[in-house]
Amino acid sequence: MCNRSYHEFKIIAVSNRKLCDRSFLEQIERVCKIDPEAVILREKDLTEEEYRTLAKEVMEICNHYQIPCILHRFWKIAVELECTAVHLPLPIFRVLSDEEKKKFTKIGISVHSVEEAKEAEQLGASYLTAGHIYATDCKKGLPPRGLEFLKEVCREVSIPVYGIGGIKFDEEQWNDMEKCGAVGGCIMSGMMEI
């Protein structure tokens, strides 16, 4: 179904345990079996301690399947757990020192405008997620930014850009995003329901 890429289009799984019909760790294992580019552990409602506990378990599963695990928001936990990939909101990334950034080999940043994309690249981001591209239940009531936005972001930065928001297991959608210059897409709902 996934196998890391469609042609060269890369798929990153984004977690949301509230969307799972089965145990979350079982769902992570199912996701790893379809071989995504990476798994972003994005559980925004957890406390730092709860996130640390869950991150250890998810990293173990990802390591078993040799799928990169990217920790979200809690960068100090990533350092503590020796996870070298992290995904951050731009406001958190802005305050990281150069020394703190050096602790990671990959830093992804969520952006919602061309200006944010340029700033994130200047600050040293490895890749960006830009969105939301399509209508999604996660952003109910908010109109999607669309493919034109994605194209503009991809044109203005030289680092890899992944579309996020309403992305499905849909080759036509992937082709459209690839034509905009995106290297891949991030799937949440579809990944939590496979």
Predicted regions: what they are:
Residues I28-D35, E60-H64, E99-K102, E121-G124, ...:
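Acidic (Asp/Glu)-rich catalytic clusters
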Residues C69-T84, H112-A125, E156-I187:
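Catalytic cores of alpha/beta
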Residues A38-L46:
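A short beta-strand-loop structural module common to alpha/beta enzyme folds
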Residues L81, A85, G108-R155:
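Glycine/Thr-rich beta-alpha phosphate-binding loop at enzyme active sites
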Residues H7-I11, D35-E37, Y65-I67, E82-T84, ...:
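Short, well-ordered coil/turn segments that N-cap beta-strands
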